[in-house]
C-alpha cells in the first residue's frame, strides 16, 4: 500500500483486524479494534482558476470540481466544512478575500480533501513591502479563541513586495507578547506542524540578510513595546538593534526580522515584522550546529526554566561566579572558557 501523509488526528490503520488492506482512519483507536470511519485515501484537493495575489480590480474565480465530488468553500478565512457554501459556479471576488475550499467524495470512499487556500487582493490593497496573509477560525478580531497557551490552526501566505505569490504553509498559531497584548495589533507565533499533513516548514528565504531557507516557527509583532498607543513609538527600535548586531557581528543571538503588512482573514491588520524564534531547536541547529539533545536552553520570565536539556552546567557556573573572587585572573579566565564574554557586553 502507498501509505502517505495524513491530516491532523488521522492515522493509517488496517481496514480489519489483522487484515492486509490499509486505510485512512479519521477516528483512530490506538491499541483497540478499528471501528468505522475508514477511507481509501483523501478526496482530490480543489484547484482554483486564478493564482493568489494582487489584482487591479475584481475577478471571478472558478474551482475545479472532480467528477463525483462536491466542493464547499468560505470567503471569511474560516476552514470550510460540510456545512459551508456549496460551489455551483465561479465566485465573484470584488474585495480582498481569503478563499478556502474543500472537496467531498460523494461515494464516501475517500475522506474529505485537504483545504486549498488563496488570498486575492483587489484594487487599492497594494503595498511597497512584502505582505503576509494569515487565516483561521475566530482570528478576525486579533484574539485567539484558545487564549493564552491555546493553539489554533492557521494558514499563512507570503507575497513579495511586487505582489507576486511567494510561499504558503499550514500550521498552528498562538498569542505572543505580554504588555503588547493590551492593544489591537497583537503579536502571534506561527508554528508549522508536519503532523497536520500539509507542510513541515516554510521553505523560502524569508530574510534578506540571512541565507536560512526553512522555518518551522516565526514570531509576528507590531513593534511590541515600541508601538504602545499611550506614548510615542518609532516602530523600529528592536528590529534596528538586532539588524545592527548582525551587520556589526556583535556575537549576539539576533532575531532576524523583516517588515511586512499583515492581513488577518482578509482584513488589513497593519504593519508588522516577522522574526526568527530563538527558543527554537531549528535556530540553534542552523546557527550553532546544535540540534535537539545537544543543547541546553534556559529561559527566564519571572523565573528560570529549561526549555531544552538540563540547567545543571549553567547553575554550576553561576555558583562559581557568585562564590569566587572574580578579580582573580585565573577565575576570570576559567569563566571566559565557559561562555562568550562578548555576548554579554
Regions picked out by a protein language model, each given a short descriptive name:
Residues 5-173, 195:
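Short, compositionally stereotyped local motifs that mark structural "simplifiers"
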Residues 16, 136-140, 158-160, 175-179, ...:
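Short, flexible loop/turn elements at secondary-structure junctions
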Residues 154-163, 236-251:
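Zn2+-dependent metallopeptidase catalytic core
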Residues 183, 188-213:
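Reverse-transcriptase-like RNA-dependent polymerase core
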Residues 202-234, 273-345:
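ATP-dependent phospho-/nucleotidyl transfer catalytic cores
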Residues 236, 240, 244, 258, ...:
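Extracytoplasmic/secreted proteins, especially bacterial periplasmic and envelope-associated proteins
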Residues 247-261:
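Short, well-structured beta-strand/strand-turn elements
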Amino acid at each position: 500500500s502507498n501509505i502517505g501523509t495524513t491530516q491532523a488526528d488521522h492515522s493509517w490503520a488496517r481496514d480489519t483486524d489483522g487484515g492486509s488492506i490499509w486505510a485512512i482512519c479519521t477516528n483512530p483507536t490506538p491499541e483497540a479494534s478499528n471501528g468505522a470511519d475508514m477511507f481509501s485515501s483523501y478526496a482530490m484537493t480543489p484547484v482554483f482558476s486564478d493564482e493568489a495575489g494582487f489584482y487591479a480590480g475584481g475577478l471571478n474565480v472558478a474551482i475545479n470540481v472532480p467528477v463525483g465530488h462536491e466542493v464547499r468553500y468560505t470567503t471569511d478565512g474560516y476552514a470550510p466544512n460540510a456545512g459551508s457554501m456549496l460551489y455551483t459556479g465561479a465566485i465573484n471576488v470584488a474585495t480582498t478575500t481569503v478563499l478556502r475550499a474543500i472537496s467531498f467524495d460523494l461515494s464516501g470512499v475517500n475522506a474529505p480533501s485537504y483545504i486549498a487556500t488563496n488570498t486575492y487582493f483587489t484594487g487599492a490593497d497594494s503595498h511597497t513591502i512584502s505582505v503576509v496573509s494569515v487565516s483561521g477560525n475566530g482570528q478576525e478580531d486579533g484574539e485567539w479563541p484558545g487564549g493564552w497557551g491555546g493553539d489554533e490552526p492557521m494558514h499563512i501566505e507570503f507575497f513579495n513586495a511586487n505582489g507576486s505569490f511567494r510561499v504558503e504553509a499550514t500550521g498552528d498559531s498562538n498569542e505572543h507578547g505580554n504588555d503588547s497584548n493590551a492593544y489591537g495589533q497583537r503579536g502571534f507565533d506561527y508554528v508549522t506542524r508536519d503532523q497536520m499533513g500539509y507542510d513541515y516548514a516554510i521553505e523560502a528565504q524569508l530574510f534578506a540578510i540571512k541565507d536560512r531557507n526553512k522555518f518551522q516557527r516565526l514570531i509576528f509583532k507590531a513593534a511590541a513595546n515600541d508601538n504602545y498607543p499611550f506614548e510615542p513609538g518609532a516602530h523600529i527600535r528592536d528590529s534596528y538593534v538586532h539588524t545592527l548586531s548582525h551587520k556589526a557581528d556583535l556575537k549576539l543571538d539576533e532575531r532576524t526580522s523583516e517588515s511586512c503588512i499583515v492581513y488577518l482573514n482578509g482584513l488589513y491588520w497593519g504593519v508588522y515584522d516577522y522574526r526568527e524564534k530563538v527558543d527554537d531547536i531549528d535556530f540553534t541547529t542552523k546557527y550553532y550546529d546544535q540540534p535537539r539533545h545537544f543543547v541546553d536552553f534556559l529561559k527566564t520570565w519571572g523565573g528560570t526554566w529549561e526549555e531544552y536539556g538540563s540547567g545543571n552546567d549553567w547553575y554550576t557556573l553561576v555558583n562559581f561566579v557568585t562564590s569566587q573572587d572574580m578579580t582573580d585572573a585565573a577565575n576570570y579566565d576559567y569563566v571566559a572558557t565557559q561562555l562568550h564574554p562578548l555576548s554579554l557586553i
